[in-house]
Amino acid sequence: MKERQRKQRMTNNLIWAGVGIGVLAIIGLFVWQAVKTPPPAEAMGEVIPIASADHIPTGSDPGAYSSDPPAGGVHYADTLPAKFYQESEVGSLPVHPEAYLVHNLEHGHVIFWYNCAVLTDGSCDQLKEQIQGVLDEVDGVKVVAFPWESLEEPVVATSWERRYSFEAFDPEIARQLVLANRNKSPEPNAP
C-alpha cells in the first residue's frame, strides 16, 4: 500500500513538474517574441501636411497638391496597379494619373517619382535599373515607380504624408524607406 502511495505521489509530482515546465516555456516564448520583434521603424522623409483626403469624381482636376509630387490629398476612388511605369506609358493612362496614385498612397504604397531629364550624364537607364531593383527586392508589393516631369531631383519618394528627395539615388536608402514607410497610411490593409 505504501509503495502504491509513493508511486502515486511520484506520478503527481511529475505531472505538476511537467505543467510547470510547460507554463514556463509559454512565458519564455512570449518574452522572447517581445524582445525579438523590433519596434516598427519610424517613417522616413519630410512630413507633408494633408488638407483633405476626400474622393473626387474620376476625371475631375484634383488641383494643386501640398507637395510636388503629391504625398496625399484628394484623389479618385480607384488606384493604379503597383509597377514600374515608363515615360512611354504615361500618354496611355487616364487623365490626372496622380489622383489615382494618391489613392495608392492612402492604401500604404510608396511611390518613386523619377525624372531622367535632370540627369546630365545620360544615366537614365542605370537609374531605372536601380529603382526596378528595389521594386524587385520588395516583391513589388505596394511600390510604384512613376515618371514625373516637374521634379528638380532625379528621384523623389512619397508615401502618405511623407516626401524624401534623392539628389543621387541610393538603393539601400530606398529599400529602408520602403520598409519604414509602406503601410503607414489611413488604409494600410487595402491592396
Give names to the regions the model predicted.
Residues 1-19:
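Terminal, Lys/Arg-rich, intrinsically disordered segments and adjacent short helical elements
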Residues 17-30:
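Hydrophobic membrane-insertion alpha-helices, especially the h-region
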Residues 27-39:
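Membrane-interface motif at the C-terminal end of an N-terminal transmembrane signal
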Residues 38-100:
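Surface-exposed, low-hydrophobicity interaction/linker segments
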Residues 77, 123-128, 156-157:
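Short, well-ordered strand-loop elements centered on a beta-strand within folded domains, enriched
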Residues 89-137:
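Mid-length scaffold segments of soluble, non-membrane domains
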Residues 130-191:
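Helix-rich interaction surfaces within compact, conserved domain-sized segments
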